[in-house]
Structure formats: structure tokens, C-alpha cells
Amino acid sequence: MDSYEYGELLKTLHNKCENIAKILNPTSLQKQLKDIENLEQDEHFWNDSKRAAEVAKQKRKCERMLQTYTNTKQEIDDALELYEIAMSEEDSRTLELLFEQAPSLLSHIQKVEIEVMLSGENDGSNAIITIQPGAGGTESQDWASILYRMYLRWSERRGFKVELLDYQDGEEAGIKGVAFIIKGENAYGYAKSENGVHRLVRISPFDANAKRHTSFASVQVSPELDDDINIEIEDKDIRIDTYRASGAGGQHVNKTESAIRITHFPTGIVVQCQNDRSQHKNKATAMKMLKSKLYELELQKNQEGASQEKSEIGWGHQIRSYVLAPYQQVKDLRTQFATSDTSGVLDGDIDEIIESVLVHTSAKDN
């Protein structure tokens, strides 16, 4: 790194700090804190302990967000000031030190930028993910299983826990469908970027003529809802079916009809759960999955009219293409982010892609 590159880095960091300011709005946070302090000075305020606890929680959140912005801005300002002094005094030793610290400074600011982008109401929730293969039989079913493994590996890398809810084996290979919960801090905030249709182009391992095939699979992501979020589902709007569990379920599978499938007529949403021996527990989990999907659908309608974008799996609401032949490239169609490290991506190294989507979405929103 040289002086010019470091100067350009500082400009980039300044832009990132401005992004953070747009999202956190420090002026508004300061006003909120002032209002809360005025509230706390009212002698009657503490009489309502429930309200006082809620306000205290909001105060801590505002303080934390404001501190995040202040620390970030200070870090960048300090680097700029030190750089200008070193340049004016031709202090090569200090400049070398700044250049050495540049990658970690950039990494830290990028991390802060991403974290503040995950400040949505449900971003801190666990994520319920359903993967469904598109048309094409074995090809797309195998592609669905590759995506499932990719998310398992990604979860491992991030230290998230995974709980399997439903698993349907494919006829020859792969899976007919899978549903699982990723549990961890900001799991939904990160995973929501994966919502959409994923396209694979490769030389088929199932084709004796070694022809190139295109396969599709849909990934649906919704937040695991707290019990206090009330979503009413009328009995007349759903059908509940029982069936024997199959696939990766353990010794009890196929012995009793403990698996549950719920069909929601107004939306056409179908959810399945077979992860427990108890039909009652599977039904409760399936209802939770349905509520989460209905909630996510409503969010999408409000935010971007996504109800218009839903289409059959194929060339519809496609978000990403994975080309393994004749060349190797994974490309996100929303951000145009591309990488030739297809094996790394399919092994769960997708943070860079996810972060590019979060930055893109946040910048668009602001």
C-alpha cells in the first residue's frame, strides 16, 4: 500500500461512516435520549414498572447505537488526523504503521456497517428456511440438496445451530424438499438475502452424454416469530394431513403417521414437519412455520410488492446463478457481485455475497 491507496481507503471509510449515519441517524438518537431523560425525571414515571422497563430497554438500545456511530466516526477521524500529520512531517515510520493497520481498520468498519444494516424488527430472529427443487426431477432435486449442504456449512462457519424440521428424499438422488431452522444472533438478518430462486448450470452427473443442464431451486426464508406476535389463522382456511415420516429422521421414522402437512388455501403455502415423534409437537411446529411464512409474505407485500414477483420456479424471481460449466462463476443478479470461487461458495463461504446484498439493499432504502 502507498499514500495514494491509503488516501482512497480513507475516502471509502468516510462513505461507509456516512452510510452508518444514514441508518442510525445520530441526531434522532440524541433527541430520543433527551426525551427519555426528561421522562425519567417525572416522579410518576417509575410508578408504572412495566412501562419503565420498556423505556429503559429503549434507552439502552439508543445508547448502544449512538456509541457505535461515535466510536466508528472517532476511529476514522483519528486515522485521518494521524495520516495528515505523518504526510506533512514526512514521517515514513508512522505511515508504514498506518498502512499495516489499514486492512484491520477496513475490516472492522465493514463489520460495523453490516451490523447496523441488520437493525430490522426481525433481523435478530432465528431463520426458518425451506428449499424446494424446481421442475426437472433428479437434476433439480440434487441441486436442492447441494444448496441445503451449502447452508449447513455456512451455519457451521458462523457458529449457528441448525434444527431439521422436514426432509423429503429425492427419487434417485437429492431431496424433494427440506425445512430447517438456523438459530443464532442475526440469523434471519443474514439469511433473508437468500430468499428467491437459485439457478445452477453444470455438466450433469446423471446424463450419460455429459450434456450441460440448467436446474432451479427456490429458497424461502422467514423469521421464527415470538409467541407474542399474533397471527390469526382460521380453521376453514387450512387443511391438516398426517403422513409417515421419511428421510433423515432416525429410528422412529415410517412407524407412525407422526408427520404433519398443513395447506393454507388463501395463499397456497404448504408447510411440513416430521422432526419429532409426537404428532402434536409436529403440528405445533408446522403452525409456527406457517405463521412465519404468512408474516414474511405480508412484510414483502408492504415493502416491495413482492406478491407480484412470486412466480413459478424457473426464470421468475431469480436472485443468483451458479455456473460450473463451461466456466466457473457465482453471480448475484441483484448486486452483480461475482466470484469464480464456486467450490468455496458451495462449501458455505457466502458471507461476502450476503454482505454485498445487505449493502446494496440498505443503500437503496436510503
From Swiss-Prot:
<keyword id="KW-0648">Protein biosynthesis</keyword>
<comment type="function">
    <text>Peptide chain release factor 2 directs the termination of translation in response to the peptide chain termination codons UGA and UAA.</text>
</comment>
<dbReference type="Pfam" id="PF00472">
    <property type="entry name" value="RF-1"/>
</dbReference>
<dbReference type="InterPro" id="IPR000352">
    <property type="entry name" value="Pep_chain_release_fac_I"/>
</dbReference>
<dbReference type="Pfam" id="PF03462">
    <property type="entry name" value="PCRF"/>
</dbReference>
<dbReference type="InterPro" id="IPR005139">
    <property type="entry name" value="PCRF"/>
</dbReference>
<feature type="modified residue" description="N5-methylglutamine">
    <location>
        <position position="251"/>
    </location>
</feature>
<dbReference type="InterPro" id="IPR004374">
    <property type="entry name" value="PrfB"/>
</dbReference>
<dbReference type="GO" id="GO:0016149">
    <property type="term" value="F:translation release factor activity, codon specific"/>
</dbReference>
<protein>
    <recommendedName>
        <fullName>Peptide chain release factor 2</fullName>
    </recommendedName>
</protein>
<keyword id="KW-0488">Methylation</keyword>
<dbReference type="GO" id="GO:0005737">
    <property type="term" value="C:cytoplasm"/>
</dbReference>
<dbReference type="InterPro" id="IPR045853">
    <property type="entry name" value="Pep_chain_release_fac_I_sf"/>
</dbReference>
<comment type="similarity">
    <text>Belongs to the prokaryotic/mitochondrial release factor family.</text>
</comment>
<keyword id="KW-0963">Cytoplasm</keyword>
